[in-house]
Amino acid sequence: MTIRFGYRDVNYPSGIIGELRDSSHLLGNVPALRQQMAEDGFLFLRGLIDRQKVLKARKTVLQHLEAHEALVPDTPLLDGVMGGRSPQMMGRKGVAYHPDVLDVIESEELFRFFDAYFAEPSITYNYKWLRAVGNEEYTGAHMDFVYMGRGSANLHTTWVPFGDIPVEQGTLVMCPESNHLDSFARIRDTYGRLDVDRDLVEGWFTKDPMEITDKFGSHWLTTNFEAGDVMIFGMHTMHASTTNLTTRWRISCDIRFQPASDPVDERWKHKGTGHTAANLPVKPIEEARAEWGV
C-alpha cells in the first residue's frame, strides 16, 4: 500500500519502511530486553497494557474533544472524526490527568515493566504529552534527548497509542540502530547533544525523515498499532511518524520513565518550568546542521 512519510509517498511494507518486530516474547527476561534495546534502540511490545483500559481512556479523550467542538457532529464518537482544531491536552492537568487516562499512562503494567527493567523502583514525569494529531500532520525525525537531556542517562520514552492506529493514520516510525551505528556518530555528537532551551535551536533534525536513511543508512520500521501496544525507546534513537492521511484524530501519549534514584531533568519535575524557550526565536535546524557539518 502507499502511505505518506513526511511529505513523500512510499510503499509499505518495503525496503524503505518495513514491519516492526514484536519483542513481547522477551518479557520476563530482563537481560534479553536490555540487549534488544541496546541493539535496536527500542522495544516494541504488543498488548503490554490491558486493551479495555486503553479503549476506555480513548473514549474519555474523545468525549473531551467532542466537548471542545473538535469532532464532526452526529458522527460516531469512537470514530474520532475531525471537526475542528484539537484543544491543548499536554501538561500536568486536564484530560491528561483524568483517572481513565492515568490508568493507562501510569498503569501497573508500565511500572511493573520498568521496575524490573531498571532493577529498582521507577518514576515517571508528571508532565504528559497527550496529543490528537490531525489530517496531513506528522512528526519529523528527531531524538528525544534534545528536549529532556538534563537528567537521567537512563531516561526512556514510552509511546502509547489510544486505540487501533493503522499506518495511514500516523504511526510511530523507528530508525533501528541509530543509537549506535557509526554512520550516525556525527549526528549523536552534534545534534544529539543539543538542548533546545539552552541552545535555542529547532528540535526536529529534519522535516523529511527519508533524508536520514538516504544520507546515514539504516532503514525505517513501523506497524499497524493496536490498543494496548507500547513502544519504548532511548533518548538517542531517531524516530518520526507517518503522515495522517485520514479524517480521524490519531490519539496517543508520550510518557517518560527512569530509575527513581537518578537525577530528574528540572524542567519536567513537579511544577517544573517545561520548555523555557517555547516563545523565543530559535535558530533554524538547517543553519545548525550546516555549522555541525551534518
Feature map (PLM): residue ranges:
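Short, conserved beta-strand element in jelly-roll/cupin
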Residues: 148-167, 224-227, 232, 256-259
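Non-heme Fe(II)/2-oxoglutarate
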Residues: 2-23, 71-73, 184-192, 227-232, ...
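Short, structured patches in soluble enzyme cores that scaffold and shape functional sites
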Residues: 129, 143-145, 160-164, 176
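Double-stranded beta-helix
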Residues: 167-237
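Generic beta-strand structural signal
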Residues: 120-127, 137-139, 154-160, 170, ...
